[in-house]
């Protein structure tokens, strides 16, 4: 495809995206809101990380310092109903690790290739952040039940593999016959089972919510796809589920986006119905589901404030080669 000049995400397209998001929020009973940043949790996370010896130097490129900002936002917004402060620090720290990996290793995948091997063989990883992550994951078996620890470790290893797969496949055309491949990569990279699991208090019987897990995962994946789409278009990111699915299905990105929003809203309703006999689980789910939306509205990473509050000026795409929605 020939290179194009930088273009604005058009006003019409912005309104289309905004309308899809607004309809989704309405169906899931989520009024638009921005949650203030929790500096107390931020300080607690940095203090704990330093105690553990994790790299958190503010000026180092091999540091979790900036990634902790994302971890604190998702924890405060999505897990505000969780009373165990140690769990909040754990979720924020886990998110900091995976955010760092997702951002730092997009073009340096040799570390990702070696992570599972060094982890399973209990060897020291040469990258300080990944060595700290391995240490963090190994402690899961001490902190949590077998089910939780197994979920954490297996999902984290899949996630690291998915980053490498996405990088290796970014210059490979998506086949129109490979309809399920974008969804497969999405499942690998989503970490949705971990985030769904921690939505419930650890002392809540797993039997009260486990049957809703498939739809919880679909909700988390679909909501993230929906609410990260605007930012990805502005940044000309194409290695994502919406872009890959649009190519494989030979439809527009907006059509895939509408379908993702519809599936996420449907999944939300299914979870509510499954959890109705269990009031505590239902309350936890509703708080998490709303908070997961607020994670995206509250994080500058996703730029939704620009869409909902600043339609006065078109935002120019950052790269010189991109495609229309």
Curated annotation (Swiss-Prot):
Obligatory cofactor(s): Mg(2+)
Top-rank taxon, per record: Eukaryota
Positions bound to Mg(2+) 2: 224, 228, 232
Residue stretches spanning the membrane: none
Taxonomic source organism: Coprinopsis cinerea (strain Okayama-7 / 130 / ATCC MYA-4618 / FGSC 9003) (Inky cap fungus)
Assigned keywords, A-Z: Lyase, Magnesium, Metal-binding
Lineage, top ranks: Eukaryota, Fungi, Dikarya, Basidiomycota, Agaricomycotina
EC number: 4.2.3.-
Protein name in UniProt: Alpha-cuprenene synthase COP6
Top EC group: lyase
GO molecular function: carbon-oxygen lyase activity, acting on phosphates; metal ion binding
